[in-house]
Regions:
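Non-catalytic cap/lid and distal C-terminal segments of serine-dependent acyl enzymes
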Residues: 1-178
């Protein structure tokens, strides 16, 4: 909605889900197996844990993504996983629901509105531990190919504690608003 927002800034955003999300599925599958593949049982246990493991945090992230990218609108308490929690096999119908929200997939469908933006800025660390720099590079190239004006910056850092990058994006957005 360029008529409402006019400008976008994105720091280390999820894009190119085959790299950004898919590699974390096996860890989530292994974690959920301890709960018979039941996300609700896992979440109930997480509420009482004093200290979360790294695998718990990644599983929480995958469940949050599942709830967002492929919600069960008739039963909002139910999380639809993009994989079989017992075998780990991808469920193509569910995974395709995720992919339709991938900025790489969405770009072509929104070219006209993207071109109307006064500012389209995104950046990512070149050592992003969640592999998001690959998706950012792909999106930058996609925008180039589609003729979408944008500014992409890659910086020497990872995914964490990058709020200093606001010093780059906020002035750009402020200029857009003025």
């Amino acid at each position: 909605h360029p008529d409402v927002w006019g400008g976008i800034a994105c720091h280390s955003g999820d894009m190119y889900f085959p790299y950004a999300c898919l590699p974390d599925f096996p860890m989530a599958i292994d974690t959920l197996r301890r709960f018979e593949g039941n996300p609700a049982a896992f979440l109930k246990k997480m509420r009482t844990k004093i200290k979360l493991r790294g695998s718990d945090i990644m599983t929480l992230m995958i469940l949050a993504l599942a709830a967002f990218y492929d919600p069960d609108l008739e039963n909002p308490d139910r999380i639809q996983l993009p994989f079989d929690a017992r075998t780990g096999e991808l469920i193509d119908e569910r995974w395709q629901q995720w992919l339709r929200w991938d900025p790489i997939q969405m770009a072509e469908d929104h070219v006209d509105n993207l071109k109307k933006l006064k500012c389209l800025f995104f950046d990512c660390g070149s050592r992003d531990q969640y592999r998001l720099h690959h998706g950012a590079r792909i999106l930058a190239q996609r925008f180039e190919d589609l003729g979408v004006p944008h500014r992409y910056e890659e910086f020497d850092d990872d995914h964490s504690s990058i709020q200093y990058r606001y010093d780059v994006s906020l002035p750009l957005l402020a200029d857009t608003l003025s």
